[in-house]
């Protein structure tokens, strides 16, 4: 470790504000410099958000709010804004007692309980708040949310990846019921068929990304085609975990700010930006393992740590990306997938 990193380590806590232990290779020096700049931004945004929410607790879907969300929701307002813009708050208000009822019914389903319990200890082993012996341990909240959701959405039940999403929602909302309804908004509305048994939506969107790369970053598409690499091997975790454990926590939360407001289109913007930003590095790959390594490398480093700059780039770098374009590509890939599975 160099001297600057050692000095920074004295002032940057080893455990972040969300309970995650920083990895051994963490760049303390860059983070210290970034966070000093970012605190100024956060203070400015907090003042603007407080003014906006004083006028009305209901967050309207207009251009001003869209702009505010793209510039980041301060942590103290994040839970409230996510709940309102996603429709989760309205669902929760209309269904008093539903979450608790689903949990009680779910606890009578041994198959569901086995699946959930198996994954509890695998969820964020690097987070002190999710450890079994933590007091209180968020594992209990996680268990409650996953059991209730598995019972509520019987088509999906429980599948791997959902534990990480529920975990992040619990960290942000600090409330089981809110986490449950936000999960329902994500899985039921925002992410089309990502977690269904056939994972049709997930498979479709990975191929849609391939189409978009072909159009916007043709040299990378050509490289991947030449080496016969399937997109699912490179990006399935980006989609299924919504960048959890792939990008830094604050960057993931900034992406989710936009995801709840603008929908799944944001995932393509993030993926395209990661690939475009590291195009030169990816093009150095000479074979299949090289390409896989490059796709792991592009999710690390200063570019993704500076979440504010990163978010500016995702709305500039990929150029225009209309919902119509994505809908057409989805339909094309969905039909292709169905015909291949016959």
Curated annotation (Swiss-Prot):
The lineage of its organism: Eukaryota, Metazoa, Chordata, Craniata, Vertebrata. Residues 72-263 form the Rab-GAP TBC domain. It comes from Xenopus tropicalis. May act as a GTPase-activating protein for Rab family protein(s). Keywords: GTPase activation. The keyword Cytoplasm does not apply. One of its GO terms (molecular function) is GTPase activator activity. This is Growth hormone-regulated TBC protein 1. The keyword Cell inner membrane does not apply. Gene3D superfamilies: putative rabgap domain of human tbc1 domain family member 14 like domains, Ypt/Rab-GAP domain of gyp1p, domain 1, Ypt/Rab-GAP domain of gyp1p, domain 3. It comes from the Eukaryota.
């Amino acid at each position: 470790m160099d001297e600057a990193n050692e000095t920074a380590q004295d002032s940057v806590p080893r455990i972040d504000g969300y309970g995650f232990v920083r990895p051994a290779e963490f760049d303390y020096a860059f983070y210290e410099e970034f966070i000093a700049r970012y605190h100024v931004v956060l203070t400015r945004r907090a003042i603007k958000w407080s003014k906006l929410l004083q006028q009305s607790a209901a967050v309207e879907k207009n251009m001003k709010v869209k702009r505010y969300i793209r510039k980041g929701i301060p942590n103290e307002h994040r839970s409230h804004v996510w709940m309102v813009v996603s429709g989760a708050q309205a669902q929760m208000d209309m269904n008093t007692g539903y979450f608790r009822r689903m949990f009680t019914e779910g606890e009578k389903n041994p198959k569901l309980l086995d699946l959930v319990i198996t994954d509890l200890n695998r969820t964020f082993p690097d987070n002190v708040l999710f450890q079994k012996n933590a007091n209180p341990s968020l594992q209990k909240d996680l268990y409650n949310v996953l059991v209730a959701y598995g019972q509520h959405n019987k088509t999906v039940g429980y599948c791997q990846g959902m534990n990480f999403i529920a975990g992040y929602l619990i960290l942000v909302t600090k409330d089981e019921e809110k986490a449950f309804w936000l999960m329902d908004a994500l899985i039921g509305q925002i992410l089309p068929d990502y977690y269904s048994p056939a994972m049709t939506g997930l498979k479709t969107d990975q191929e849609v990304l391939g189409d978009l790369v072909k159009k916007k970053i043709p040299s990378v598409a050509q490289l991947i085609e030449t080496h016969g690499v399937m997109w699912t091997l490179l990006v399935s975790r980006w989609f299924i975990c919504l960048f959890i454990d792939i990008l830094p926590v604050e960057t993931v939360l900034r992406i989710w700010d936009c995801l709840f407001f603008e929908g799944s289109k944001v995932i393509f913007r993030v993926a395209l930006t990661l690939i475009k930003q590291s195009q030169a590095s990816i093009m150095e790959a000479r074979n299949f393992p090289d390409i896989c390594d490059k796709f792991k490398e592009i999710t690390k480093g200063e570019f993704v740590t500076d979440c504010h700059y990163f978010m500016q780039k995702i709305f500039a770098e990929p150029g225009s990306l209309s919902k119509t374009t994505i809908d057409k590509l989805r339909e094309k890939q969905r039909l292709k997938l169905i015909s291949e599975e016959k």
